[in-house]
Amino acid sequence: MDGLHSILEKAVESPSHWQVLLDASASLWRYSGGNVALLMMQMAQRGTDEPTLVAGFKEWERHGRNVLRGEHALWVIAPRTARVQQVLLPDGTRHRIPVGDKAPNGAVDEGKKTLITGWRGQAVFDVSQTEGTPLLVPRSAGLTSVEVPRLWESLAGVARAHGFSVQVTDSQFGLTSGFTDFAQHRVQVGGWLNPEERAAVLAHELGHVLLHGPNDNVGKLYGSSVDHRGLAEVEAESVAYTVLKAHGIDRGPQSASYLSGWADAVIEAEHSAAGVTSRKEPASRVDIAKSVLGRVTAASKEILEVTDPPGLGGKVPAAEASLQVEGQETYAGVKPAQEPSRGLEISGP
């Protein structure tokens, strides 16, 4: 795992390397941050391009594509799952039993659930390692003036789903572009901003909503909660960058240099605490980078599942496999009059 360690270390050291991780996370947003980094590491070790669309051997076959002879699998971490039946016992407690087992007397069946019981390695292949039927993958050429309000509404819907109202105002706290008030469950966005800027600010504030509430125990553990405001800002801005990038909006180089400075500050504080009152092993820079990447990608995925950007998020099953490119107006191979293509035909070698 030296390669993975190196990727995370560089991400802490260099804003450009952090941006590369975020760009990959935007393309592969259906994957966890850890798996994105794993895929990037393995492709880099082979001297090939970054992964764009990955799937298992049989999944590629279902879409009319075959893995090229001699290609070696990429590996990601996948959950082991088990189906169980949840029952409510007479004393009010809940109990889970294997599906098919007899429930205790007096128990009320509450239905079946899928539980994660462990983790395993799963072999996948990038589209560049396959050949066969072209995959027609929608992509964004940037949001139009019509699409920006739709993005805004879907982002506001995420806020409402978490119990926050969204206000566009010229008089919010500190006259900042955006502000999240956890006490009032309210997100405020500057009324002087143009529609695209408002969407960007709202995406940033959603990063705070999803990651930095008063019960953010993971953030406190790794120094990225509101107790370490600079690193919390890096997380929120990274969420905004990833979400907007997935929608075809490039926010430019991120200020990931903050990550290095705040990671060092957290480590120094933990070293001091460890020498006085705590026996906890201080976090390393890579531990902090791993935590931030995982939190950012998890929050981004939750948002993107609602905003539904073009593309497949790096996973194949939702792709349309077809020998016919013609007639698909939103796919590559067809350029509507006076308009650029808004799709990508991936056909491999």
Per-segment meaning from a language model:
Residues 1-347:
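N-terminal accessory/interface modules of nucleic-acid-binding and processing proteins
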